[in-house]
Amino acid sequence: MVQSCSAYGCKNRYDKDKPVSFHKFPLTRPSLCKEWEAAVRRKNFKPTKYSSICSEHFTPDCFKRECNNKLLKENAVPTIFLCTEPHDKKEDLLEPQEQLPPPPLPPPVSQVDAAIGLLMPPLQTPVNLSVFCDHNYTVEDTMHQRKRIHQLEQQVEKLRKKLKTAQQRCRRQERQLEKLKEVVHFQKEKDDVSERGYVILPNDYFEIVEVPA
């Protein structure tokens, strides 16, 4: 579904070649969503998860300066509307003295476009990543995921170092075991040689016997 602006009279639709972003109604924040609905000034209009307002209806200070100003601030409310929905016939038939004075006109579209164009240059990203944010927390989620990946990479590196240390310790123990085997083998050979040698008896082991002539 191609995104389009829900503001009355606005013909903007999503086009990757135009520096116009679209922002979903904050349905999860009822109070802020009511402010958006009131700003749109459309009777019997109930936004859905597919409803959005384009960036031309927000003043430049509504955007965050990071990420090429494609994200709205948390409490941003659209205020720039050149067209409003026509009133009922009953209201149109009021006497001239009863009619309210017209509201002040907002700045021309060209001026707003120029301001947005200066503050919001087109975002140069790959085609598969050029879709505008569906909500205001996409970049925050991406940053959190990158931070988590970095933490996992650090943990993997620590485990690799521990594994390397354990392997070195194991090799040292194997060398020590080989040395002990050599010592035991040498001791056995020495014991075998001792068993085949002469036995020296003490001097008092023999008794001198006198034989008569």
Curated annotation (Swiss-Prot):
Changing residue 26 to L: In DYT6; lower activity than wild-type. Changing residue 43 to A: Does not affect DNA-binding. Changing residue 55 to A: Does not affect DNA-binding. Changing residue 48 to A: Strongly affects DNA-binding. Changing residue 45 to A: Strongly affects DNA-binding. Changing residue 150 to P: In DYT6; no effect on dimerization. This is THAP domain-containing protein 1. It comes from Homo sapiens (Human). The lineage of its organism: Eukaryota, Metazoa, Chordata, Craniata, Vertebrata. The gene is THAP1.
